[in-house]
Amino acid sequence: MAMPRSGNTLLASIINQNPKVACTANSITLEIMKDIFFLKKTDVFLNYQDHKSLGNVLSSVFQNYYKDWPQDIIIDRGPAMTDGNLILLQKHLGQPVKCIVLWRDQLDVLASYIKWFENEPTAYPNHYGKTIEEKLFKLMNDKGSISKELRSIQNAMKPENQKHCFFIRYEDLVKEPEPTIQGSYEFLETDYYPHRFDSLDQFNLNGIAYNDNVVGRNLHTIKTELKLEENPYKKMIPQSIIKKYGHIRL
C-alpha cells in the first residue's frame, strides 16, 4: 500500500526475485470486494436479503483470484487500510490482515509526477490541464488514487491499526535496501531470501507486464540501479501546491 510514485514497482521488482513470494501490480481485488458489497444496496438484494450467501462470495474473492498463482505468499497492492476496506478484509480475508506501507513525502511524490509528465507526452496528467498547477491539483482530487492511498495510509497510522502494518520509507528502500527488505520478511514471518539490489528487472509477474499505453509510457519503468538523487523538478512545484500539501510528511 502506498501513494503512486512511492516505490511500489521498485519494491515489487526486488520482492519478486523470490519465487515463493508475489508482490502484485495495482490490484483489482479490493474493487471486486467493494462492488460485491454494494450489491446490498440494489433493489434485487433488498427484495431478498441473503447476507450469508453474499458473504460467502466476499470470503472467496482472494482465494479464487489467486488460486492459480504458484507463489506461497501474495502481497496484494491496494488501499487496504481505508476504513471500509479494512472492515471487509477483517471479516472476509480469512487470516490476519498484514499490510506493508510504503511512504514518500507528498512533495517528492508530486515532483516525481512532474518529471514524468514533463518528459512524456502520453502521460495521462497532460490531459488534465495546460499548467503544472492544474495538473497537480487534478491529481490530488479527492476521488483520485493519490488521495485514496493517502487516506489509507493516514488510517494505518492510527495507534489501533499500526499493529497490522510495516512501514517503509522510500529513502530507506533506496539507501538501505537489504535491512529494509529483511524487515518486511520478519513482518511477514517467513524465511528471508537473498535478494539482488542491482541490475534490477522491470516489473513482470507470472509472464505479465504493465501495459503503460493505457496511462502513459514509462509510468512503471524503474531504474535498474538503486541511487537516491535530488529531483530537480521539485523546484517546479507551484507555491499554491506547496502551501496546500507541503505539510504531508511522515
Stretches found by the model and what they are:
Residues 15, 65, 89-90, 184, ...:
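Broad structural signal for hydrophobic residues in well-ordered alpha-helices, predominantly aliphatic
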Residues 226-250:
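C-terminal accessory extensions appended to soluble enzyme cores
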Residues 1-62, 68, 203-207:
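PAPS-dependent sulfotransferase catalytic core
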Residues 31-35, 173, 246-250:
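C-terminal/domain-terminus segments
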